[in-house]
Amino acid sequence: MMDGASPVDRDVSPVGLPKKRIKQNHDQVFLHNLPDAPRYTKSYMHNAEIYKCFPTKSNYILSVSYDGYVKFWHKTPNGVEYIKEFHAHNAMLLSAELSQDERLFITGADDKSLKVFDVESIDLVNIIDLEFLPKAICCFNSPSLKTSLIAVSSAESPLIFFFESGGDGEVLYTVKKHTAPVHCLRYLSTLDCFLSIDIGGMVEYWSPEEPFQKPDTAELFNMKSQTDLYIFKKQKSVPTSLEVSHFENFWSTISYPDCKVRVFDTKSGRAILELDENPSNAAKKVEALFEKEDTESSYYMSHVELGRRIAIERDIEKHGLTVGTTAIFDESEKYLLYGSIVGIKVVSIDNGTVVRIYGKDEAVRFTRLSLYQQAPKKSNLPSLDVIASNNPLVEESFQKDPTLFATAWKKQRFYLFSNMSTKFTLSDRDVYNEQVLPVTNNEGRQENGNILLGKAAIIHTTQGDISIKLYPEEAPKAVQNFTTHAENGYYDNTIFHRIIKNFMIQGGDPLGDGTGGESIWKKDFEDEISPNLKHDRPFTVSMANSGPNTNGSQFFITTDLTPWLDGKHTIFARAYAGLDVVHRIEQGETDKYDRPLEPTKIINISIVYT
């Protein structure tokens, strides 16, 4: 004790020992700043599959879809309100990103252009024409360069080009740090350096100034050999995305084909957390839970549902770098959030435990995530009188409204997870803010008035994909009916309800028992018997019926020669790939009524128009 200290400064505990400092556990506080609703509370539409949502601290939400549309929304306590939209590109979107200060939003498309938006004024402020296809975009303010720059990697070379955000499109300088195109690019303001990953899995740290080397600072690792930055090369896997935490202490990746989620310490370059999300491991967990009859586990699901989800995971893995599944951090840097086969997991970075799961019971696979942890209502300069007024409206304006924004695999909606206090019902949470059309207006579709005819289709099932060639010239009505039903999701999650070995597999009934289904015209339509098409080979796709001119929605795929069906059933397609999938479905066990004991589900059907 210091000389002259008063008795009140002394430790006067009865045991005569110093009091232990109580270590406060803030985990519950940090979790309180995350949404607590297990299911999504709202969803909103675009007319095409959505790339990502970008929430800002100024309460603007930006959503962008692959057809080049950018929508501005305003965050409200009960969701979002639409403000304005731009048709930024008449081409397929390739990349989009917010600037670090959230003032600018940049999009890039395969029309070889960048569009620059001012977020606060909600306006398109610049167009930059490129001589290359853009890949990754990063808009940053470097203290050493004292200006706002846009870094854009080329999809065709390892080069990264730098432009002024408000400039005339002149290339300021070019950097080559990789031997393959760079698809992940982030600027670390705390270190004034870039973090980049190429499509070969190589990771680099480098300064935005010449000679573009790793910053010479004691905060960073000395040699790359001391880090885990070669891990993707060693595992022969490539990250699909790169996310940096709020204070830039960590960064995360999701890589394929090893299906690993990793968290790295920024300064040491070491992997501090590795999570295995391989679908085969999930299948093993489900089997073990079935044996234990553990229905409380997050991995518990039926075999049919497991098959459906594994098929989606394999589809995502097959598309690789184009998926861009993300693993994001909360603002406290305590938790990592990412989509998985069982929903969106919230994982503790300290020990890797799953503390929360969102969307386990939803039928979609969530991919790109973004987190809003602000208060949707703000008073610019509240007075002391206002703060002390105990007015519930004032209190509400200062309350945080944590909201998780998620896009989903092959979906035209973005989804909001918020708090349980948000009132919603499952029947009205999906907002139809766009006109629901039979088919979205993508390039390459055959249009004749309102008639839309596909050239081919891919039937995504829980056993795998079946590709079929359509015959719009021979059976235009049957193809139109099948195409429109597929695009509208009519066949989604239906089953192959009737299986007869050495004959056929039948599906297309939303009731799942062979008694339901109707055409897009709400009535039976006539047969289209073509002399050019016969049931003279297996894998012929025909309309099921109950007599002449009674076609609805059901169809079947033959597995052998069936000449007795000629003249009785409309042939509108033939399978040309995934024939093994057809055989696997055919070989499934059935009851005496030809109903499968473990039905194969149709996840959805993709239509090809070119």
From Swiss-Prot:
Residues 453-607 form the PPIase cyclophilin-type domain. CDD domains: cyclophilin_WD40. It holds the Pfam family Pro_isomerase. It is found in: Nucleus. Keywords: Isomerase, Nucleus, Phosphoprotein, Repeat, Rotamase, WD repeat. The keyword Nucleus applies. SMART domains: WD40. GO terms for biological process: protein folding. GO terms for cellular component: nucleus. The keyword Cytoplasm does not apply. Its EC number is 5.2.1.8. It catalyses: [protein]-peptidylproline (omega=180) = [protein]-peptidylproline (omega=0). The modification Phosphoserine is found at S13. WD repeats lie at residues 45-83, 88-127, 177-216. GO terms for molecular function: peptidyl-prolyl cis-trans isomerase activity. Coiled coil: none annotated. Belongs to the cyclophilin-type PPIase family. PPIases accelerate the folding of proteins. It catalyzes the cis-trans isomerization of proline imidic peptide bonds in oligopeptides. This is Peptidyl-prolyl cis-trans isomerase 9. The gene is cyp9.
